[in-house]
From Swiss-Prot:
<keyword id="KW-0378">Hydrolase</keyword>
<dbReference type="GO" id="GO:0005737">
    <property type="term" value="C:cytoplasm"/>
</dbReference>
<protein>
    <recommendedName>
        <fullName>Isocitrate dehydrogenase kinase/phosphatase</fullName>
        <ecNumber>2.7.11.5</ecNumber>
        <ecNumber>3.1.3.-</ecNumber>
    </recommendedName>
</protein>
<dbReference type="GO" id="GO:0008772">
    <property type="term" value="F:[isocitrate dehydrogenase (NADP+)] kinase activity"/>
</dbReference>
<keyword id="KW-0963">Cytoplasm</keyword>
<keyword id="KW-0904">Protein phosphatase</keyword>
<feature type="binding site">
    <location>
        <position position="348"/>
    </location>
    <ligand>
        <name>ATP</name>
    </ligand>
</feature>
<dbReference type="Pfam" id="PF06315">
    <property type="entry name" value="AceK_kinase"/>
</dbReference>
<keyword id="KW-0418">Kinase</keyword>
<dbReference type="InterPro" id="IPR046854">
    <property type="entry name" value="AceK_regulatory"/>
</dbReference>
<dbReference type="GO" id="GO:0004674">
    <property type="term" value="F:protein serine/threonine kinase activity"/>
</dbReference>
<keyword id="KW-0547">Nucleotide-binding</keyword>
<comment type="similarity">
    <text>Belongs to the AceK family.</text>
</comment>
<dbReference type="GO" id="GO:0006099">
    <property type="term" value="P:tricarboxylic acid cycle"/>
</dbReference>
<keyword id="KW-0816">Tricarboxylic acid cycle</keyword>
<keyword id="KW-0808">Transferase</keyword>
<dbReference type="GO" id="GO:0006006">
    <property type="term" value="P:glucose metabolic process"/>
</dbReference>
Amino acid sequence: MNHFPKLLSSQIGFDVAQTMLEGFDRHYRIFRDAAIHAKTLFEQADWHGLQKLARDRITSYDERVEECVELLEDEYDAENIDDEVWQQIKLHYIGLLTTHRQPECAETFFNSVCCKILHRSYFSNDFIFVRPAISTEYIENDEPAAKPTYRAYYPGKDGLAATLERIVTNFQLEPPFEDLTRDVGCVMQAIQDAFGVFDEAPNFQIHVLSSLFYRNKSAYIIGRIINGDLLMPFAVPLRHVKPGVLALDTVLLKRDQLLIIFSFSHSYFLVDMEVPSAYVEFLGTIMQGKPKAEIYTSVGLQKQGKNLFYRDLLHHLSHSSDQFIIAPGIKGLVMLVFTLPSFPYVFKLIKDSFPPPKETTRAQIKEKYQLVKRHDRLGRMADTLEYSSVALPVSRLDEALVRELEKEVPSLIEYDGDSLVIRHMYIERRMVPLNLFLQNGNDEDIEHGIKEYGNAIKELMQANIFPGDMLYKNFGVTRHGRVVFYDYDEIEYLTDCNVRAVPAPRNEEDEMSGEPWYSVGPHDIFPETYGTFLLGDPRVRRSFMQHHADFFDPALWQRHKDHLLKGELADFFPYDGSVRFCMRYPERFADAAGAASNEQDAPDAGRSVRAA
């Protein structure tokens, strides 16, 4: 600080700091309560309840920030507090965090509140936490000894099978398991298939995070196996095989598999963490190289992830010299997109005006992005970070980009000395646009890209998402080869769409016409027409018809819509179906299959399953 207070003499400074910390503590209680409630909903197989819980939790943070801002304005006239007192407020707040279990998240909450009250000129480390002040290393859990951040198990004493069974039962889930002994045997077989027979080192042990990770219809056990110098990650998804009966679905043993389930294209996990930094540290050991910002985001602390990401961006800018440029690919009608080649993200701004045929507004587009944020993304829609008042050095902006910004988004930019301040933007992970992937790829790439594209849209359909504009340029290919949707301005709920077949032409003139000879309502969709803009390349057509010939059949789209209108939720697996135990080791499931067959033969079986 330029004028570091020698004496913290302001009572108002302490009171404001205390009020802000109480606001954060209320937020984090609600955050943890949601994760605790997720366990009950999972046990009850209340999937709609879990979806609502996840949606409500996303909006909870901003609601707590607004509550705190209003309280500070009403009680302390916060906008008129002078600079010296604001500096003392931060120092008092630091003092209050010295024994806190979530100091890094509390610092971010402080920033969120201050940014609502203070002018942008105050966004420096004198007044807010541009850099962290409290270390998060070695924070101990305050829970009872029965629930540390992670538990350590030593299989040498009781054997691996008994240890694995104890790991599962320690989570004390209420529904019984269909056959836990069988499932544990599958885990052991999968470990042997992956690593062969290995000698147990003296330090052979298994570490398991004490809370389950809930998302969709699964609860994940997350841990690591340590043997000598080796550290092996694992994740075990638990699922209901039928109402009220659980099973271990598979075991994921590869880093890449874990990176996918913690990907930016999936919804956030519901997980109870008293010391979130300890969870993030643990997860970092099993997904080495994954930024902490992304890990915080994946466990539901998206504001902390957003804060860390911005710090990473500032750090990168100070240690790089390349320029921001217009993103390669076809320019969008609605968004201006630019990137920094040395930084794996894109920056997206909503244009001031849109040419025909686009009929939308900036407010409507923002609402579409919020819809995606709240919705279950299923690994098929990119998450976005939303920022306001981002200052970028003018010297790092390519001249062509500056001209494009001044032409397309003059209302969003403002020059401030050596910086260009952007009033609003979205930031996403950079991917290879699918149109470029197909254009530059060989036959194998095209087959993979088209198969993934069709799978992505079919999964989005099942999640009640109609992408709207399905051109290949609106999809990207991740570094793991998955196709992900990232253009949201025309997105709709499938249940709001009217699926129609193209009426037969009335005469030869209709048949030769380049315009529709039938009426088209604002929510009408015609799957039969999609081939016109998707199948121009013969290689693409061949792959499309091989893997997704039903894509252009209105019956497929209507069937998914009908299931959604009945309240049915499809099963989704963020891993290849071939690794599921029931597919990988079918011989171990023969008894279960026989029992299921007998149940179906019983007169009341079908009715009870449907009712459930």
